[in-house]
Structure formats: C-alpha cells, structure tokens
Regions:
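A short SAM/SAH-binding and catalytic strip from SAM-dependent methyltransferases
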Residues: 108-120
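Short, cationic motifs built from Arg/Lys/His that form the positively charged side of catalytic pockets
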Residues: 40, 131-134
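Conserved functional loop/turn residues at catalytic and ligand-binding sites
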Residues: 101, 106, 114, 137, ...
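Glycine-rich, phosphate-binding/catalytic loops in enzymes
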Residues: 76-80, 98, 127-129, 156-159
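Conserved N-terminal segment of class I S-adenosyl-L-methionine
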Residues: 1-105, 109-111, 235-242, 248-249
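S-adenosyl-L-methionine-dependent methyltransferase catalytic module, highlighting the catalytic core
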Residues: 34, 120-124, 128, 138-248
C-alpha cells in the first residue's frame, strides 16, 4: 500500500466519512456505526464481492473518502492509490473536475463507488477513468438513481442504467456487466429507514446504541438476500446501478 502526501487544490468540500467496511464471508458491508441504513451498502458490497477476481495489480480508489473498501481490496492488489476531492489523512487530494495527475494506462483496476453524482461533468470524469485505465483493465463504477440528495450542495445528477451504460461506451469502454442496487422493495425500505432516522434525530435519539441496534438488526438479517440482478422492476426503480467497464486490448 502506497500512501501519497496530501496536495491541496482549490476544491475543498465536506464529505461523509464512512467507516471501514466489515468483511463477512468476503463481502464488504457498511460500517454500522456510520449509518443507520445498511441495505444500500449491502447491495454494493455483494456486487463488489462478485467482482473480486477482476481486482488486481495497481488500483485507483477514485473518490475514496476515507477508504471504506480498503479492508476488501487491500490484500488483492500490489498497490493502491487513494484519491479524493476532500482532504483526508493519507489520501491524495485532487480536484475531480480536472485532469487526474496520472499518466495514461497507469492502473489495472479503478474503483469509483457513488462518486460521479458529485462531479458536475461526469463525461469528463469518465474520460479520465478511461484514459488512466490500462487496456484489458476494469473499472468498477456504482452510481445512484432513485436516491435522496446528499452531501449538498455537491450533488449534481442521477443515472438510469441506460445513462450509465451510455456514459461508459462513449469513452471507448465495454460494458462487461450491468447490475442494480436492488429493486423497488429495497428502495422503499431505504427511504423508510431514512424517515425513521430523521425522527430519531428530531428526538435526539439517533446516537442511542440500543435504538441503533434495533434498527440495524432486521437489515443485518436481510443483507445476504439483497439482489443486484438487473430485473425488470429494478430497471424501473432502483437505488442505483453498477457497471463493470472493461478497456479493450
């Protein structure tokens, strides 16, 4: 693991700091101390676990926050480069709206989870992903669709599965896999937990450990059943979509 010194840019913005993912049977799940809604993270985590054979070599964790997925990808790669627009210890701070400070074809794997909605020009960002990815390499990209505004005012857009696939293809990458972050049921469950979270905050009970455990328990029980299949219902209503983008040889 190589960590780069922080380089200041003109873009300094706050970012939600998700705790390290918990590995359960090789699946990275959301840190329960960081969020009350665990099901979206379960969808992304289960999907990432299926892509594990593609994770290798030199990895770029683009928009990494505080690297919640490091426990998952760390043992799989020879080197990881963490990059984010917000300052964090051991993370290279880069304005994601500009060019990435890396040469062409420098990474075997790129991880970009729930980041592109926070970049005003997603076309530019995907172009940079394609540029720094080596031929034959894979980019694992997840984006939201029917998802509440977050990290305002740095929340600019949402993506349908058609939009995500088109974004990838326009920059010369192949869609090796396209999946969903659950369907309508998961989406409604997530919104229900968010509503409950707001009630607990109004009552100043959001940090109550007993209540947090009660909210988490049913989600923990259901996390292994979360589907990431791009089913017909999920094509219409999903929290988001996930793509494996491959750069042709």
């Amino acid at each position: 693991m190589i960590r780069y010194p922080v380089t200041m840019t003109s873009t300094v913005r706050p970012r939600h700091r998700q705790g390290p993912a918990r590995l359960v049977g090789g699946v990275p799940y959301s840190d329960r101390a960081s969020t009350l809604s665990l099901l979206p993270g379960a969808a992304v985590g289960r999907w990432l676990a299926r892509q594990a054979p593609l994770v290798c070599g030199r990895l770029l964790d683009l928009g990494c926050g505080n690297q919640p997925f490091l426990p998952w990808y760390g043992p799989k790669v020879a080197e990881a480069v963490p990059v984010d627009a917000a300052p964090a210890r051991g993370v290279l701070q880069v304005d994601l709206a500009g060019p990435l400070p890396f040469p062409d074809a420098g990474f075997d794997t790129i991880l970009c989870t729930q980041v592109l909605e926070h970049v005003e020009n997603a076309e530019h960002a995907m172009g940079e992903i394609a540029r720094v990815l080596r031929p034959g390499g894979h980019a694992l990209v997840t984006v939201p669709f029917l998802y509440p505004t977050h990290e305002a005012p740095y929340d600019f857009q949402r993506f349908t599965h058609h939009g995500l696939a088109g974004l990838v293809r326009r920059h010369g990458l192949e869609v090796a896999a396209l999946d969903a972050q659950g369907g309508p049921v998961l989406m409604l469950a997530h919104f229900g937990v968010l509503a409950l979270t707001q009630v607990l905050r109004l009552l100043r009970l959001a940090d109550n450990r007993v209540l947090r455990a009660l909210v988490a328990a049913p989600q923990e029980a259901l996390r292994s059943r979360v589907s990431t299949r791009l089913s017909l219902p999920a094509r219409v209503a999903s929290l988001g979509y996930m793509v494996v983008a491959r750069k042709p040889l």
